[in-house]
Amino acid sequence: MKRTYQPSVVRRKRTHGFRVRMATRGGRAVLNARRAKGRKRLAA
């Protein structure tokens, strides 16, 4: 059986990247929450 996670840098960036997060209000909320928590990496 094929595994569900087949990594692709392009797909990863397009769905979870910084630019995508910044595009929507909810995404910006995610970034702000991660900043408040002190995350080293904000987005993929």
UniProtKB/Swiss-Prot annotation:
PROSITE patterns according to UniProt: RIBOSOMAL_L34 (PS00784)
A single MF term (Gene Ontology): structural constituent of ribosome
GO cellular component: ribonucleoprotein complex; ribosome
BP GO annotations: translation
Keywords for this protein: Ribonucleoprotein, Ribosomal protein
InterPro entries xref list: Ribosomal_bL34 (IPR000271), Ribosomal_bL34_CS (IPR020939)
PANTHER family: LARGE RIBOSOMAL SUBUNIT PROTEIN BL34M, MITOCHONDRIAL RIBOSOMAL PROTEIN 34 FAMILY MEMBER
NCBIfam families reported in the protein's UniProt record: rpmH_bact (TIGR01030)
Family of the protein in this entry: Belongs to the bacterial ribosomal protein bL34 family.
The protein's name: Large ribosomal subunit protein bL34
Organism from which the protein derives: Herminiimonas arsenicoxydans
Encoding gene per record: rpmH
